[in-house]
Regions:
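A metal-dependent, Asp-based hydrolase signature
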Residues: 1-26
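Short, acidic loop-to-helix structural element flanking the phosphoryl-transfer center
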Residues: 3, 19, 30-57
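Alpha-helical elements of Rossmann-like donor-binding domains used by nucleotide-donor carbohydrate transfer enzymes
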Residues: 4-8, 28, 44, 99, ...
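Alpha-helix C-capping/helix-to-loop hinge sites
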Residues: 9-13, 32, 88
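Helix-turn-helix-type domain boundary/helix-start signal
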Residues: 15-16, 36, 94
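Asp-based, Mg2+/Mn2+-dependent phosphohydrolase catalytic module
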Residues: 47, 63-146
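Conserved phosphate-coupling serine/threonine residues in phosphotransfer and NTP-handling enzymes
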Residues: 60
Length: 146
């Protein structure tokens, strides 16, 4: 499964790797995943939201076991209730499909994400307000974040 995902992701960029290289990539990826942390700036923002009783949710693509482990390592349970986590493999829709956003009935939401393709396009197509964490300095195409 994981080997297929990296092969499919690279194919989007017209790059192909064999199974041995995909497995090597996945092995290194797993090792690096053990050390992920939430930045102090993000912790401060999440604390501020929580202290002001502003709901926080997560919409994420990927296999549930992998995503839940990542959220556990990031200690997201300090800020996000389990019922406010929407994982594509569980709910049956993936970003940027607006259906995954439409599962959240409270439309007074602002979506924050770092992927233009998945987060900005998905949120805007679901008629959500959206903040793009554009860490790579990419240029927005047709759909603009708020």
């Amino acid at each position: 499964m994981y080997i297929y995902r990296i092969q499919a992701a690279l194919k989007e960029y017209y790059l192909e790797i064999d199974e041995a290289h995909a497995l090597a990539f996945q092995t290194k990826y797993y090792v690096y995943q053990q050390d992920i942390t939430t930045s102090n700036a993000i912790k401060d923002i999440l604390d501020l939201l929580k202290d002001n009783h502003i709901g926080i949710g997560i919409i994420t693509n990927g296999p549930a076991c992998h995503q839940m482990e990542k959220l556990r390592r990031l200690k997201m349970s300090n800020w996000v209730a389990l019922e406010d986590i929407y994982i594509s493999s569980v709910v049956g829709y993936s970003k940027p499909d607006p259906q995954i956003f439409n599962l959240i009935t409270d439309k007074d939401c602002i979506y924050v994400g770092d992927s233009y393709e998945n987060d900005v396009i998905g949120a805007k197509n679901a008629n959500w307000k959206c903040i793009w964490l554009n860490k790579k300095g990419l240029k927005a195409m047709d759909i603009k974040p708020d």
